[in-house]
């Protein structure tokens, strides 16, 4: 009697099925990771402007611009945000956008970042907002799915 070597077809099919399940799970987790990293990136990019806005408000320069008694928070361009520069003297690179804010700035200024088509498809058109309160504190809210938001940012369906 000959001794059998190797695996049976059934055993190989089971291994291939297990690898397929693991690969599909890993792909879904990676896609969620990409979305979460983009949301966190925009949270930080928009959040950087809070200090500049506070400086403008403290100096009493609330109109956006480069002139005397004007303020430029210096919003830098991002390839996953939509929105034109609000300072007419500043030109941003093509296919980039900047965080939007009211002109003039107010005590309850909202820094609004809208995700463009370069962001993950599940967050196209979603907004992330840093909202200033009269007390000077800031809070973050967004209409992106809650599972993608960092712990410091709350889901808000009304946006």
UniProtKB/Swiss-Prot annotation:
Modified residues (N-methylphenylalanine): 7
TM ranges: 7-27
Keywords in alphabetical order: Disulfide bond, Fimbrium, Membrane, Methylation, Transmembrane, Transmembrane helix
Positions of the propeptide removed during maturation: 1-6
Record Pfam families: N_methyl (PF07963), Pilin (PF00114)
Example GO biological process: cell adhesion
Protein's membrane topology: Single-pass membrane protein
Subcellular location: Fimbrium; Membrane
Gene Ontology CC annotation, any one: pilus
Disulfide bonds: 56-71, 140-153
Family matches, as InterPro entries: N_methyl_site, Pilin, Pilin-like, T4P/T2SS_Core
Alphabetical list of NCBIfam families matching this protein: IV_pilin_GFxxxE
Family listed: Belongs to the N-Me-Phe pilin family.
Subunit details: The pili are polar flexible filaments of about 5.4 nanometers diameter and 2.5 micrometers average length; they consist of only a single polypeptide chain arranged in a helical configuration of five subunits per turn in the assembled pilus.
Record PANTHER family: GENERAL SECRETION PATHWAY PROTEIN G (PTHR30093), PREPILIN PEPTIDASE-DEPENDENT PROTEIN D (PTHR30093:SF34)
Protein name per UniProt: Probable minor fimbrial protein
UniProt organism field: Dichelobacter nodosus
Taxonomic lineage: Bacteria, Pseudomonadati, Pseudomonadota, Gammaproteobacteria, Cardiobacteriales
């Amino acid at each position: 009697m000959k001794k059998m070597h190797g695996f049976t077809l059934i055993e190989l099919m089971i291994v291939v099925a297990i690898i397929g399940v693991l690969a599909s799970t890993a792909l879904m987790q990676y896609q969620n990771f990409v979305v979460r990293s983009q949301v966190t990136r925009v949270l930080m990019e928009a959040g950087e402007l809070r200090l500049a806005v506070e400086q403008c408000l403290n100096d009493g320069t609330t109109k956006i611009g480069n002139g005397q008694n004007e303020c430029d928070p210096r919003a830098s361009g991002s390839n996953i945000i939509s929105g034109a520069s609000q300072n007419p003297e500043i030109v941003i690179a093509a296919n980039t956008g900047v965080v939007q804010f009211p002109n003039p700035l107010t005590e309850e200024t909202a820094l609004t970042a809208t995700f463009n088509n370069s962001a993950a498809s599940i967050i196209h058109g979603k907004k992330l907002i840093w909202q200033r309160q009269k007390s000077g504190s800031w809070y973050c809210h967004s209409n992106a799915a809650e599972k993608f938001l960092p712990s410091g940012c709350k889901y808000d369906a009304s946006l």
